[in-house]
Amino acid sequence: MMESEVDSERTMLKREIAELRAALNQKEQCLRELDSLFSFATRPEQEVVGNDLESPDVAVHTKLTNDDIARYSRQLILPDFGVQGQLKLKNSSVLIVGLGGLGCPAAQYLAAAGCGHLGLVDYDEVERSNFHRQILHSEDRCGMSKAESARIALLELNPHCEIQCHSRMLYPHNAMHIIRGYDVVLDCTDNVPTRYLLSDACVMLSKPLVSGSALKMDGQLTVYNYANGPCYRCIFPVPPPPEAVTNCGDGGVLGAVTGTIGAMQALEAIKVIVGMGDVLAGRLLIFDGGSGVFRNIRIRSKRPNCHMCSAQPLITELINYEMFCGMHATDKNNPMLLLSTDERLSVEDYQQKIQAQPHLLIDVRPTAEFEICQLPEAVNVPLVEILDDSYLKRLGKQLEDKELPIVLVCRRGNDSQIAVQHLRNRFPTHFVRDLIGGLHAWTNSVDPSFPIY
């Protein structure tokens, strides 16, 4: 057998082993979730509730201490707040779901204001890409649970605040137990399935839900399920198509925008707890960070035939929200599978077999991302230009060569698959492939010095 054939066989076997391992990991994760769901359904309720699922034990305080008076003096002198407002806050419990760009400032201001008990829900770990907006985390806590990292920072700010960490994802089988013991819930997540899950659970448990979102330079804020106001399903009875949803990991966000919305989520929670001001129920606050303009608009009232919060709801228990929305309940990379493996290239195959030969390498990321980092000889043609064929004039001569391999790359190997499908329809006789895993795979498998963002 020739050396080249041996190399090809070894590469193919490595690829098959990697695919089998990935499939095994996926099956094992599914089995763990099924085991968890089965054990939850068959065990008595008191056994199901573990340490981080138990309702917070909030002591009832009837007066302020000298430390309270000194610490909170600037808000105690507010006529609409006063001693009674501070006591309500001290006796309250707030659940913050998501300790990211929104949850960090929200938790910080609630702890600083004297909220008696905070629950922190986040399954994720701290990483460097968090620091520009997730202000409770620090360099020395990289790899730590975000909930635990936030707890450390909050206790440094206010050691009198009781903090309970729920370092797990919310699922239909655990959400009710976690949420039940809190007075107010803050939705600081970045995905649609969790928004539906939180809204439905809060309706069932009669909890106000303070919902915030931020993307690029814009932010939004409202309060659901409060004072006979609408729930999330009243406004969005049908989830958006998955391809229309962008999170901050893909679309980007300015840290000060998440800070603005997160701080205002804390403000709305305080207003709900204390009973002061005009709560943003039935209204949507829209923040345009580019112009510095806040707008306040009316949203539709409670829907009489809402499947969740109407007098005769069709939904009486929590459902599979990932299936309902057609997307994952996480902002982590969820690889698309538009092409089969043999229609694509691993980064190792590209480096060994194609990179040194004449070929056309097209990077389909937006120009702003291309400027951050790029592979040698890559040509930037954003996906939108691929789809509208505006790239044809730029690359016409190269595309006329049917023998010239065309390789497409993006950040994670998702958009490049869409581009491959489009180019194959346009140039059916050309060799067109994309890089599996994109630039992230290049860093992980070929060049560790190549930056990840």
From Swiss-Prot:
SUPFAM superfamilies: Activating enzymes of the ubiquitin-like proteins. The keyword Transmembrane helix does not apply. It is found in: Cytoplasm, Cytosol. GO terms for cellular component: cytoplasm; cytosol; molybdopterin adenylyltransferase complex. Keywords: ATP-binding, Cytoplasm, Metal-binding, Molybdenum cofactor biosynthesis, Multifunctional enzyme, Nucleotide-binding, Nucleotidyltransferase, Phosphoprotein, Transferase, tRNA processing, Zinc. ATP binds at G101, D122, S129, N130, F131, H132, R133, K146, D190, N191. Its cofactor is Zn(2+). Its main location: cytoplasm. Disruption phenotype: RNAi-mediated knockdown results in reduced levels of urmylation and increased resistance to oxidative stress. RNAi-mediated knockdown disrupts the circadian rhythm resulting in flies with arrhythmic activity when exposed to constant darkness. It catalyses: [molybdopterin-synthase sulfur-carrier protein]-C-terminal Gly-Gly + ATP + H(+) = [molybdopterin-synthase sulfur-carrier protein]-C-terminal Gly-Gly-AMP + diphosphate; [molybdopterin-synthase sulfur-carrier protein]-C-terminal Gly-Gly-AMP + S-sulfanyl-L-cysteinyl-[cysteine desulfurase] + AH2 = [molybdopterin-synthase sulfur-carrier protein]-C-terminal-Gly-aminoethanethioate + L-cysteinyl-[cysteine desulfurase] + A + AMP + 2 H(+). GO terms for biological process: Mo-molybdopterin cofactor biosynthetic process; molybdopterin cofactor biosynthetic process; protein urmylation; tRNA thio-modification; tRNA wobble position uridine thiolation. Binds 1 zinc ion per subunit. It is an enzyme of class 2 (transferase). Zn(2+) binds at C231, C234, C306, C309. Gene3D superfamilies: NAD(P)-binding Rossmann-like Domain, Rhodanese-like domain. In the N-terminal section; belongs to the HesA/MoeB/ThiF family. UBA4 subfamily. This is Adenylyltransferase and sulfurtransferase MOCS3. It comes from Drosophila melanogaster.
